[in-house]
Amino acid sequence: MKTFALILADGQASRMGGEDKGLALLGGKALIDHVIDRVRPQVSHIAISTNRNLEEYARRSPHIFPDARQWQHFGPLSALCTAANDLQLATADWLLVVPCDMPYLPGDLVARFETVSKRTPLCNAYYVETPITMHYNIMYIRPQILQSAIPYLFSGMKTLRSWLQQQRARPVRFEFDGHFADLNTQIDLQEG
C-alpha cells in the first residue's frame, strides 16, 4: 500500500505572535523537522502545505505548495482543497495528514491506521482519538475524498470535524495523549 504524508504548515500562528510555527525551534531543531523525522519512516513521500518561507520548506521536501488563492485563510481545509488538485498526491492509496506542530507523533501511526482500515475497507477516512480528546487534524484518508472538501468549503463550512463527519470518518484510538501534544505557543516550546 502506498501512503503519502501531507504536513500542514500553512497556519497563521497567531498564538506564536505570527512566527512561522513549522520553523520555530524545539531543542535547536525546527518543529517541522521533528514531524518529518517521525513520519518519514512510515510513508513513501512527504508533501508540505505552506503559505510562506517556501524556499526554506523546499529544503525539506521538493513537494511543497501554498494554498490556492481562493481558499487562503480557511485553516486546514484550505490545504485539503488545494491538495485535491495535486496529481502526485492523487496517486497514493492513503494520505496521512498531520500538522507541523506535533513533534511527538507515534512511530506506529500509519501502521495503526492501516490495521483499522483493513478491518473496515469501506471507510475512506480516519482520525485520532485519545482518552482526552479527538484530534481531527491528524487524518488517514483516501486522496479521492479531497475533492469533497471544495464544495464543503464553498458552502460556508469550515471545520475539519464536520467535514470528517460528512465523510463518515471513524476514530482510531491511541491511549497516550502525549504523542499528540501540539506546541502552539512560545511557552509550549520552552516546556516541550
Swiss-Prot record:
Cofactors: Mg(2+)
Localization per Swiss-Prot or TrEMBL: Cytoplasm
Listed GO CC annotations: cytoplasm
Record-annotated membrane-spanning stretches: none
Binding positions (Mg(2+)): D101
Domain notes: The N-terminal domain determines nucleotide recognition and specific binding, while the C-terminal domain determines the specific binding to the target protein.
Subunit-structure text: Monomer.
UniProt-recorded name of the protein: Molybdenum cofactor guanylyltransferase
Organism: Neisseria meningitidis serogroup C / serotype 2a (strain ATCC 700532 / DSM 15464 / FAM18)
